[in-house]
Amino acid sequence: MEQTWRWYGPNDPVSLDDVRQAGATGVVTALHHIPNGQVWSVEEINKRKALLEEKGLVWSVVESVPIHEDIKTQTGNYQQWIDNYKQTLRNLASCGIDIVCYNFMPVLDWTRTDLEYEMPDGSKALRFDQVAFAAFELYILKRPGAEETYSPEEQAEAKAYFDQMSEADIAKLTKNIIAGLPGSEEGYTLEEFQAQLDRYKGISTEKFRTHLAYFLNEIVPVAQEVGIRMAIHPDDPPRPILGLPRIVSTIDDMQWFVDTQPLAANGFTFCTGSYGVLAENDLVKMAEKFADRIYFVHLRSTQREENPRSFHEADHLAGDVNMFGVTKALLTEEYRRKANGDNRLIPMRPDHGHQMLDDLKKKTNPGYSAIGRLRGLAEFRGLELALKKVYFND
């Protein structure tokens, strides 16, 4: 697989020199300074591309070209935003960039309650605490109708959690959930956040699927025409939250996705950490079944906790994800493609490393400190080497 690294642009505390020293050859990045919905010009794309090439790196994957909320809700100027998206794809293709990762999650890209969860070894990880999240939804945000999604026992547990919170605790939890994370343009006050949630009133799972289907049928033919492979990222976490629909969470969702728009340009970002949170998801089976549609890979592992809806980011080769089996399935697909004349490697990046060692003293993007990802990339490099020697005689 191609070893890549997510980079948040010139303001990322991890430099391109750091990326090279980590052993990555490809960069996963986006033009975060361009507002959601606006066209990425050839000039801006080439400017970023040149910045990477100066350091001997290539722009392997765009993560992400964000999808405007109007497109997801099919309101406002959604057709204009779709037309802009098509032009951005054409511009990327003209610059030689051919993989675009994106997601179709409403409002929030990914959600955690704790961005500094201390592990037994003293490193820090990202965590989703279901009880804390329920306390936020029920007693801080006070989302109308939220009580319908929790049992009386869950509500009592959340209330007890909320009652022992200080004002500082409430502010921190709120910020963690709604202030947005790296790669996301959004950051909301509680009132603004609720207003965004309200945009999805009346949009059921089935209705939301029709919105995604419309987007796919508009965008994917353009991607196919210009040689871009679209790679949708799964929901994180892979279940409905905050009354919002989620439609890219399971193997059945993946099948619907392929059936809805069967062109080869319509594919997946296989994020093991996102899919792996759901115990029912057999990641090896999913990787094998949709191998020919996997165009980009995020490798990380999560550990489900005593409350099965709570989880934290585990060490990359630990946790609930069968990383051995998944990597073997992906390499099998890579060799199959090679036998059929496609020598392109599947780009892989280590996802969400722990904050550790010297990075504990630094200001870092949550989940995206250097050393934890350096460790993860080195571990995946070793795993891939061993698999190739033992199973593929390479």
From Swiss-Prot:
<dbReference type="GO" id="GO:0042840">
    <property type="term" value="P:D-glucuronate catabolic process"/>
</dbReference>
<dbReference type="GO" id="GO:0030145">
    <property type="term" value="F:manganese ion binding"/>
</dbReference>
<dbReference type="InterPro" id="IPR004628">
    <property type="entry name" value="Man_deHydtase"/>
</dbReference>
<keyword id="KW-0408">Iron</keyword>
<protein>
    <recommendedName>
        <fullName>Mannonate dehydratase</fullName>
        <ecNumber>4.2.1.8</ecNumber>
    </recommendedName>
</protein>
<dbReference type="Pfam" id="PF03786">
    <property type="entry name" value="UxuA"/>
</dbReference>
<keyword id="KW-0456">Lyase</keyword>
<dbReference type="InterPro" id="IPR036237">
    <property type="entry name" value="Xyl_isomerase-like_sf"/>
</dbReference>
<dbReference type="GO" id="GO:0008927">
    <property type="term" value="F:mannonate dehydratase activity"/>
</dbReference>
<comment type="function">
    <text>Catalyzes the dehydration of D-mannonate.</text>
</comment>
<comment type="similarity">
    <text>Belongs to the mannonate dehydratase family.</text>
</comment>
<keyword id="KW-0464">Manganese</keyword>
<dbReference type="GO" id="GO:0008198">
    <property type="term" value="F:ferrous iron binding"/>
</dbReference>
<comment type="pathway">
    <text>Carbohydrate metabolism; pentose and glucuronate interconversion.</text>
</comment>
